[in-house]
Amino acid sequence: MRKSPKPNFARDGSESRQDKFRSFNKALKTSKPSKDFSRFKLFIEYEGTRYSGWQRQENAKTIQGAIVKAANEIFSNDFVDLQGSGRTDSGVHALCQIAHLDAKTVLAPEIIRMKLNDLLPHDINIREVEKASQNFHARHDAKTRCYLYQISKRRTAFGKNYVWWVKDKLDFKKMESASKLFIGMHDFSSFSDDDPEEKSTKVLIDDIQMKEEGDLILIRIVGSHFIWKMVRRIVGILVEVGRGKKSEKDILNYMNNKSNEVAKFTAPPSGLFLEKVLYEEEKLSDDLNPAIKI
């Protein structure tokens, strides 16, 4: 008789992140919305400092969980589902996350926006709501995702939740040159943690842009999708290049040979923003501007 796989547990004996995701997604797959519902496209911004990421988890405060709670109050038994374009990690922010919301009760998009914002905490805001086709899917239809990372060259009293303050002097030109190595289709297994949600560690990076603006270094990474901690580890290794502790040769070695060393260079979540999610025929502005100025 075949034995069921044993669950993974964290060091404190609690269920691991991977098993929490498996349980949650199993529950999602067993509850399919009926055809008798309306679908709405939500444009969401949030300050992720207080949250354990986007995806709803048991016994954890999450962005999706907060919006689902508010939607349940508005639609009661008529609320069906809420799905985001992707998961942001604990502490990561969003300038424009996209989600679709399904409900059997038909309300005007602007009424939904106002009612949700009345119930949501101060650090989550629904910027806009649009009526969408039932065939629209926030995650599956997304063509491109864009992340912005902010590095601060100085200590800041007001912006510490929105930047990574790097005390060392950084060589911007070396960082910018090294960033181009990531463009294209590559195996990013050295730059991510194991994730049960992802079938492959290969990711297409369309572009990486960098810019110095005042006391900030801005890094924009544009790709088809991103795997767990990937963006923060790319930023972290670029900072090591800027410090003079790593080279382009080291990056190529990490990309060609799986290594656990990159994990220790993971940049903090505070400086990371989901900037934009693009769908068919949508284009990203070439302007690279700070999410929060300091």
Regions found by a protein language model. Name each.
Residues 2-294:
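Structured-RNA-binding interfaces characteristic of tRNA pseudouridine synthases
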